[in-house]
Amino acid sequence: MDSKLRTPNSELRTLWEQDPKRTTLPLTLDEVLSQVQSYISRKVLFWGERAGEISSYVAGWLAGKGITVIVLDGANRFDPYTVSSLARRAWIPPERLLKSIRIARAFTCYQMATLMGERLVSLVHARAVGAIHESLLQKPWVILLGPLTTFLDEDVSEREVRPLFERSLRKIEGMASEGVPFLLFQSNPPHPPLRKGEEGRFMSSKRVYLMKRLFQFSNLVWRISLDEELQIVLEKGLTEKYQMTSTQSQISSS
């Protein structure tokens, strides 16, 4: 089974078949995931275009490796059909991969904070116990899809969002320190509507704050771009020691 999932890049391209110009990666997804797997402290962010589709593919790819996956979906973008399609192309029964993936969805920032806090602890424990006979050392991998999306709700003030988001990050940090790997997938957050007065500035401030914190929190940051072709580019790694990247500077000045 492993040999059929060793080069996911060719399979991932089917997501972009409608555009023949977008068919190559300067660094293959397989190479990216191999780096992620060998990284000790795994809080890895993939951000940019089509993050939801790529996260669905990665969940199936990990499940195909025999890894238990938990998906917390705050963007309502996880697609089980992508997993099924990957399984069929690898000659694996789709049910086998789907059974290894547990999905929990959130539609408000309060629900997302609960998932990232108390709920995730119980999910990881339950999945670890269920997989104990398969691997005594293997911990479930957690995919956070759209970790910022619900927190960008215009109806929730920045004063409420900041402590809620910070508590959620502390929960994730604690679990990551215990060896639970986290992959975060965030599409480009929408720019605030152009408005006159304080409300427009308020939304811009919240968006900048959330993006900055997500970048600072993540050990590795990969940017997904579809300008000319599909690209996955490393923007932050070990040597940067949590410093803000040039992309973060661009965000803060926008």
What residue ranges belong to the model's regions?
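Arg/Gly-rich low-complexity intrinsically disordered repeat tracts
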Residues: 2-13, 132, 243-254
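Conserved inter-motif catalytic segment of the P-loop NTP-binding fold
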Residues: 74-154
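The Walker A/P-loop phosphate-binding site
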Residues: 2, 9-88, 93
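Phosphate-binding/switch region of NTP-binding enzymes
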Residues: 166, 172-191, 199-254
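Structural motif
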Residues: 45, 141-145, 183
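Alpha-helix N-cap and loop-to-helix initiation/capping positions
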Residues: 156-164, 206
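Intrinsic disorder
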Residues: 9-10, 128, 135, 202
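Glycine-biased, low-complexity coil/linker segments
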Residues: 131, 195-199
